[in-house]
Regions:
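Peri-catalytic and regulatory segments of divalent metal-dependent proteins
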Residues: 1-90, 103, 142-143, 162, ...
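Short helix/loop segments within enzyme catalytic domains
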Residues: 1-23, 109-172, 196-198
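Catalytic-site beta-strand/loop segments enriched in glycine and acidic/polar residues
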Residues: 51, 67-78, 108-125
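Residue-level signature of catalytic and energy-coupling elements of molecular machines
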Residues: 52, 132, 175
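Acidic/histidine-enriched alpha-helical segments
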Residues: 83-94, 148-158
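Membrane-active amphipathic alpha-helices enriched in small hydrophobic residues
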Residues: 87-120
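Beta/coil-rich, acidic/histidine-enriched accessory regions frequently appended to metallopeptidases
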Residues: 166, 170-199
């Protein structure tokens, strides 16, 4: 919980310092640990509700690992990814329904799901995940955590999954290998541009 509030405070100072409106100013922050040792996951809902499952803690290993995932989850909330996904899904469904009626004169119940999953949702979600990875690095670094731990978390996650994990084409997330590569590229840039701030 302290890690989440420390990152929250760093975000507040970041936006204040840059004379920008803080997108988290109306959030009701809540950090929950779900007692489930089998689930290795964390998630964020709009408005600052963040949950970690106890099963992910051995992979995170330390406060810097927790901060890397916490920063990532908070970044989803800051970037309002949930709202983006909902509006994209609605527009896609309406467009597919119109095409089905115009071209075929009937609805194909599975069509919208397949088009969204393989044509729009997956790449869009991977893009959001990459954005959250980058913003998460910034937020964690501003809060004073060691962001080198971010790619180490993914190395441990990859090992836990028994290799590289699912094919990136079929996944909403970038592959662990791609994530590790990108995080290693971004870390020196983030360290130089967004040093830790005093909270």
């Amino acid at each position: 919980v302290d890690i989440g509030f420390k990152i929250r405070d760093a975000i507040n100072i970041y936006y204040e310092t840059n004379f920008q409106e803080d997108p988290t100013s109306n959030f009701q922050w809540e950090f929950v640990l779900v007692d489930d040792d089998q689930t290795k996951n964390a998630w964020c809902m709009p408005g600052g509700k963040i949950a970690f499952y106890s099963g992910i803690l051995p992979i995170l290993k330390n406060a810097d690992g927790v901060a890397s995932v916490m920063g990532h989850e908070i970044a989803h909330a800051v970037a309002r990814h949930s709202a983006e996904r909902a509006s994209t899904a609605m527009v896609t469904d309406l467009g597919i329904m119109a095409l089905e009626q115009f071209i075929l004169g009937q609805r194909l119940p599975q069509a919208a799901g397949y088009v969204r999953q393989f044509g729009l949702d997956l790449p869009f979600n991977r893009k959001q995940e990459s954005e959250a990875d980058y913003l998460g690095l910034i937020f964690s670094n501003l809060a004073g955590y060691d962001i080198d731990e971010s790619y180490k978390v993914w190395e441990r996650m990859k090992e836990d999954m028994g290799g590289s994990g699912p094919s990136e084409f079929f996944s909403t997330h970038p592959s662990p290998d791609n994530r590790i590569t990108k995080l290693k590229e971004w870390i020196p840039l983030v360290n130089a541009k967004y040093p830790a701030i005093s909270t």
